[in-house]
From Swiss-Prot:
InterPro entries: Fxna-like_M28_dom (IPR048024), M28_fam (IPR045175), Peptidase_M28 (IPR007484), PFF1_C (IPR053975), PFF1_TM (IPR053976). GO terms for cellular component: vacuolar membrane. Its main location: membrane. It comes from Saccharomyces cerevisiae (strain Lalvin EC1118 / Prise de mousse). The active site is at 200 (proton acceptor). May be involved in vacuolar sorting and osmoregulation. Residues 528-610 are annotated as: Disordered. Residues 37-359, 413-428, 483-496, 649-668, 714-976 are vacuolar. PANTHER family: METALLOPEPTIDASE M28 FAMILY MEMBER, VACUOLAR MEMBRANE PROTEASE. Zn(2+) 2 binds at residues 168, 201, 300. This is Vacuolar membrane protease.
Length: 976
């Protein structure tokens, strides 16, 4: 009997038991989180267990060290060295293989001229034409069954000018080399193409050029390896559809890592990045975008180096791609289901996939069936008189307390915006913790105050039912979003899981009421009529706050007395109207009617409320009363809390550093944090009002600490720096001043840092800082002149870019007024690989340029040229981007054709000044090498000393990246 009493005491719905269970739940969630984030570091292949994998990893790590020895953007000479090294490694690996072929775009002089939508800004209406000379390296492994649709594996070997490219995309490149080495030893069934492509960073151009190669016709599937962060685990960022997601599920058995929340966030443009996968997808390929995704404040900076990554990160990408490519290469694929996929992994142990369309159908079933079942059970319980009647005060306290928590949260978020809006960049845990604890603390205070004055007999059950109603409304809204987005909102699946589990908990409660004995309520009424002062030694003290169960001194009770007390639970309608009537939720009895009285029968066989009820019924009711809350808790709290916590962490982990990219991103992150914390709080709110004083005290303390950290701590540190964008601009049309542009977030961060630079501090250099769009600040000052070229004389920066007009018939009398105007330009640019021409007419709203021609040989006389590429556009061309490989070839030869104003608007007005058909051409040329030297008059000097100064003297809480495709931009302009 004592063992039974102890067991019942431990499992009874008491403050201590609930608080302990909450502690256990969140401890398990924390341990799972740590396990998930650290486990991959312990899974490196060992030489004695997996010698082949160990060799692949060690070789890949060595390749990575060589590739990332220096910065190697497309605009640098180091880029050619990386190309040559990769070509050498590819030839070593393929050797004399009978089924391997190698194609080098640089050797074959492959180039393309094509019209391109801005790949990084889909909303841009700027019409762009791009000329690109490729140095992609392609390898074909012909499969045993060449009839099978081929698989492309792709990664880019260029970096940005300010990063070594260890994760972006050195790890992807060396993982491709490892995959190539593996498949050379294990010939695939289907044909594999490897694309080591160049110039992804400034237009996804290497991937675009792939479709100019004949091998592109062999491939249907693609694995793209990318780095949009700077380490950690490689995530399945995007996948084409449910079929490809299931292929990942079937192939990646060890350490799978993916979440369709990333996919939805990326397609919704919450991340201002893009990968080659976009190009492959637009060209009809299906596959997998596997990428590093964090931290973004180190992405594209000097810290994207081998020092800040690890073999564990490399192995995670390498092994993931190897498992996936080996499966695809050797198996027939079921690709019938092409609807978008919802997918996620469970701590790297299991990968789950469901079609977003199927999820929508299940949502519809849940939305239709659950209220029908709930209402049906409610009507049955009303008919059987087992449903408690509750006042409107009882029904409104849970939603009102939740609403109050949201209002207080909004006020707190306003304080964050005013005092420390970029706090998420440093550590998103503190603001999320502050939001979460504030919501549950507010709910606790309001519900318990309400229960003190207006006790509720069944607060937990009412809250669970109301939570079901709230989640039903949310699921209806999210299902509408899912349908209207053509099932592209693949990150909404956590709400479906949460709704399902909370629905089961609510229906179990309603089912218990519906199956209750109708005589019990009658007996309860009779007992109140005949024993208004009923009391016994088996009754414990009622809690003033109206909590649900009693903490009973077990030694004072007999078995039947326990049963008798439990019988009264949840079956007597008693909602008191004031503090003088204290109601116990379990027993539903008004404490004012339960004064101790001699007339109360004390013996087991006496007439009492259990009269007419069988011992079996008492036992069943006792079991439900004491233990049903545990079932409800286990349904509503652990699984939804883990999934929602993980989902919020996934979102914040990917987006927290985007607050540095503008005010819109800041508000997006803040909104996600607020909504996420509310969703994290919902599972425990029906129970939290009953926690003990230790738990609520710790909650209040955690809120105070979190709020203080959120509002007061500086948002940037050495390990979490503010990323600032740099460029040095020389506008030859306005002189030779080398104006340094530093772009970063507003908030008095940039100017104090710049004022401490030696070249500014000890001179009269003026810094001009202005607010630009989207909460960004641009600071400009005249910096030290760059030394882009080695020379034996004084460097004249104006000689870097020269524009020669070879032909222009705008004012020719031989041209008809209705005839397009034609001009030819020769750009003379030294040691350069990239320039951009922008076309504009002062008298026409849209660009009048309709045709661009790029000549292969850039000679001074047009009769010696050969036309290589021509492109036309009826809608007009705003911009021409030029990318060439040969540094020694110092000219770009361009032909431009544009419409006179008469053709575009039909206006015959006089043009006495002859200016209405003028075409303004702005030229910008880019240099991206800074970590090297030029020799000027026999002395070695740094190429971009202004950037060196920032790197050397700025606090470590700043990191620097390029603003444009080069660090130095020389500009000029002409009118044709």
């Amino acid at each position: 009997m004592k063992l039974k009493s102890v067991f019942r005491s431990v499992l009874k719905y008491r403050k201590t038991n609930l608080s302990l269970l909450l502690l256990i739940t969140y401890s398990i969630i924390t341990l799972l989180y740590i396990f998930d984030h650290e486990r991959y570091k312990l899974n490196l292949p060992k030489e004695d267990e997996h010698p082949e994998f160990n060799d692949l990893l060690e070789t890949a790590w060595g390749d990575l060290q060589i590739i990332t020895a220096s910065f190697h953007p497309y605009t640098s000479k180091e880029n050619d060295k990386v190309h040559d090294y990769l070509l050498k490694r590819v030839l070593e690996i393929t050797g004399n293989s009978s089924f391997a072929s190698v194609s080098d775009d640089k050797e074959s002089e492959r180039s393309i001229l094509f019209q391109q939508q801005d790949p990084f800004n889909e909303s841009s209406r700027f019409s762009r034409v791009t000329y690109f000379e490729s140095s992609n390296i392609l390898v074909k492994l012909e499969g045993k069954n060449p009839e099978e649709e081929g698989l492309l594996l792709s990664a880019h070997f260029d970096s940005v000018p300010t990063g070594y490219g260890a994760t972006d995309d050195g790890m992807g490149v060396v993982s491709l080399l490892a995959n190539l080495k593996y498949h050379i030893k294990h010939r695939p069934n289907r044909t594999l193409i490897f694309n080591f492509n160049n110039n992804e960073e400034f237009g996804l151009l290497g991937a675009s050029t792939y479709f100019n190669h004949s091998w592109s016709n062999l491939t249907k599937y693609v694995i793209n390896l990318e780095g949009t962060g700077a380490g950690g685990k490689a995530v399945l960022f995007r996948t084409s559809d449910t079929s490809t997601a299931k292929i990942y599920q079937q192939s990646v058995k060890e350490n799978p890592f993916g979440n369709s929340i990333y996919q939805q966030g990326f397609y919704s443009r919450y991340v201002r990045s893009e990968t080659d996968y976009k190009i492959y997808e637009e060209n009809g390929m299906r596959g997998w975008d596997v990428a590093f995704y964090k931290p973004r404040n180190l992405y594209h900076t000097i810290k994207d180096s081998i020092q800040y990554t690890s073999k564990a990160s490399l192995w995670h990408m390498l092994h993931t791609s190897l498992q996936l490519s080996a499966y695809v290469a050797s198996n027939s694929l079921d690709t019938a289901d092409q609807t978008p996929a919802c997918y996620f992994d469970f701590i790297g142990l299991k990968f789950f996939v469901i079609s977003a369309k199927t999820l929508f159908y299940w949502n519809c079933i849940f939305l239709l069936v659950s209220p029908v079942v709930a209402i049906g059970l409610y009507l049955i319980s009303r008919d059987r008189m087992t449903w408690k009647s509750h006042s409107w005060l009882s029904w409104t306290r849970f939603p009102l307390s939740l609403a109050a928590g949201i209002i207080v949260q909004k006020l707190f978020s306003n304080d964050i915006i005013r005092s420390n809006p970029l706090t998420f960049s440093r550590n998103y845990f503190w603001p999320i913790s502050a939001f979460f604890t504030q919501v549950i603390f507010t709910s606790y205070v309001l519900i318990n105050c309400s229960n003190f004055f207006f006790p509720c007999a069944d607060m937990k059950s009412l809250s669970i039912i109301e939570l079901f109603i709230i989640l039903w409304t949310i699921l209806l809204f999210t299902s509408k979003l899912l349908y209207s987005s053509d099932y592209r909102y693949t990150g909404l699946y956590p709400l479906s899981i949460f709704f399902l589990l909370s629905t089961i908990a609510a229906i179990l409660r309603l089912l218990a009421l519906a199956l209750g004995m109708r005589t019990r309520k009658r007996l309860g009424r009779e007992c109140r009529d005949h024993h208004s002062n009923y009391s016994s030694h088996s009754q414990i003290d009622m809690e003033r706050d109206g909590q649900e169960n009693l903490e009973q001194p077990q030694d004072q009770f007999t078995s039947s007395q326990d049963d008798q007390a439990s019988i009264q639970d949840d079956n007597v309608s008693t909602t008191s109207a004031g503090p003088s009537h204290n109601v116990d939720e379990d027993h539903g009895m008004d404490s004012s009617s339960q004064q101790h009285d001699e007339r109360v029968p004390l013996l087991k066989g006496s007439n009492s409320m259990e009269e007419g009820l069988s011992t079996r019924e008492n036992s069943l009711k006792l079991e439900y009363t004491d233990y049903a809350w545990i079932i409800q808790f286990l349904l509503i709290v652990p699984i939804p809390s883990f999934i929602l916590f993980n989902s919020v962490d996934v979102i914040m982990d990917a987006l927290n550093h985007t607050v540095q990219e503008g005010s819109k991103a800041t508000f997006d992150v803040l909104r996600f944090g607020m909504v996420g914390s509310i969703l994290m709080a919902l599972p425990i709110l029906p129970f939290f009002y009953k926690v003990n004083y230790i738990t609520i005290s710790l909650t209040a303390l955690l809120f105070l600490i979190s709020a203080s950290k959120t509002l007061l701590v500086h948002p940037f540190t050495n390990s979490n720096p503010l990323k600032v964008r740099f460029s040095q601009n020389i506008d030859l049309s306005q002189g030779n001043a080398a104006s340094v542009h530093v772009l970063g977030r507003e908030g008095n961060f940039l100017k104090p840092m710049l004022q401490d630079l030696p070249s500014i501090k000890y001179s009269s250099t003026h810094i001009n800082c202005t607010s630009v769009t989207n909460g960004m600040e641009l600071c400009m000052y005249d910096g030290m002149q760059p030394n882009l070229l080695s020379t034996n004389g004084n460097t004249n920066i104006s000689s870097m870019v020269k524009v020669h007009v070879l032909h222009n018939n705008r004012n020719s009398t031989e041209r008809s007024p209705y005839e397009p105007i034609v001009a030819e330009l020769l750009l003379e640019v030294k040691e350069n690989r990239a320039c951009t021409l922008t076309f504009e007419s002062r008298h026409q709203a849209k660009s009048p340029v309709r045709e661009i021609t790029v000549y292969q040989k850039k000679n001074s006389a047009p009769q010696k040229t050969n036309i290589t590429k021509t492109i036309k556009s009826a809608s007009g061309i705003n911009e021409l981007q030029l990318h060439k490989l040969d540094f020694d070839q110092e000219t770009y030869h361009i032909g431009v054709q544009w419409f006179p104003k008469l053709l575009t608007d039909g206006n015959l007005e006089d043009d006495k000044l002859g200016t209405k058909d003028e075409l303004s051409v702005s030229i910008s040329c880019y240099w991206g090498e800074y970590d090297s030297e030029s020799v000027v008059n026999g002395t070695a000097v740094r190429k971009i000393p202004a950037f060196d100064e920032l790197i050397n003297y700025a606090p470590l809480s700043f990191s620097f990246t390029n603003e444009q495709k080069g660090l130095v931009i020389v500009k000029d302009a002409i009118i044709l």
